[in-house]
A protein has these predicted regions:
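Short alpha-helical elements
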Residues: 1-288
Length: 288
């Protein structure tokens, strides 16, 4: 019997072939499905690892599996393959909506041990782990790109006070969907929809060069500056009001992601682990 929040039989059948074999050279793995369900329990509840129910096995095993598969890229590969499968049957809608959301970081997320060479100093991050410090405390910003159905295509993490517009092109550059057969990976959406925070002339120009339709309203100050120049201000950029209404899919995706309490508040010390947790949640959304 499948417990609440655990992998369904259908979801397990989809990802099982993408996991390392349970038995092989070296020590035998603990059952993958049990361990993944343990990680999902942690994401759903936001509880400490040591509170993991006994039915999921030792908490150290689940924690180590999360660490190991984060390091070797297993979670990212699973998400990529799930998206490839949907795209091969035409289910991925290449109308991309982007937005960001700030999450409060728990005090325990700070103080990750530094290993190796000193981390580069940044005015936007604390210890280089995607943590920003402000009067409200520590925070991380999630920059998200979703397809036309509101399913996550790409996530970028920054410190909480980082701007939105500088992350738009990195978000799009990270979208590469391999073909299920011959052909180059698809990386260019048909349309990108974003709010006023992304309305910048350089952004519009960059997307125009890529042949991407950009739907974003002008900011009030941009309208005023253009009006002040009179005829030299040029024409306003095209704006499709009906298409812009579809932008709410990215807000709904954030709502679904934050149903996982471990994501609604960041507890992970390492930004790589928080990114992995977001990737796992994205896999769950794609498999629903």
């Amino acid at each position: 019997m499948v417990g609440r929040g655990e992998l369904t039989d259908r979801a397990w059948a989809a990802i099982a072939p993408l996991l390392p074999p349970v038995s092989g050279g070296g020590r035998r793995w603990r059952d993958h499905r049990q361990v993944i369900n343990a990680i999902l329990w942690k994401l759903r509840t936001g509880a400490p690892w040591r509170d993991l129910p006994e039915r999921y096995g030792p908490w150290k095993t689940a924690h180590e599996r999360l660490r190991l598969w984060t390091k070797d890229g297993t979670w990212a590969r699973i998400l990529d393959e799930v998206i490839v499968k949907d795209d091969s049957v035409g289910d991925v809608e290449w109308v991309i909506s982007v937005d960001s959301s700030v999450v409060r970081a728990h005090q325990h997320s700070a103080g990750a041990r530094k290993k190796g060479a000193a981390r580069p100093k940044s005015t936007l991050a604390v210890d280089g782990e995607g943590l920003g410090r402000s009067r409200g405390g520590l925070s991380t910003k999630i920059h998200l790109a979703v397809d036309g159905r509101g399913l996550p295509m790409r996530v970028v993490l920054t410190a909480g006070q980082a701007g939105d517009n500088p992350q738009l092109l990195p978000l799009l550059d990270g979208i590469r969907v391999r073909r299920d057969g011959p052909g180059r990976p698809r990386s260019r959406p048909d349309v990108v929809i974003a709010d006023k925070a992304y309305s910048h002339p350089s952004t519009r120009q960059a997307l125009r060069r890529r042949g991407i339709t950009f739907v974003s309203p002008e900011r009030t100050d941009q309208i005023a500056q253009r009006a002040a120049k009179g005829a030299r201000g040029g024409r306003p950029p095209a704006f499709d009001t009906e298409l812009y209404k579809q932008r709410n899919v990215v807000e709904r995706c954030f709502n679904r992601l934050k149903q996982f309490r471990d994501l609604a508040t960041r507890y992970a010390k390492r930004v790589a682990y928080y990114q992995a947790e977001l990737t796992i949640a994205a896999i769950v959304l794609w498999l629903r």
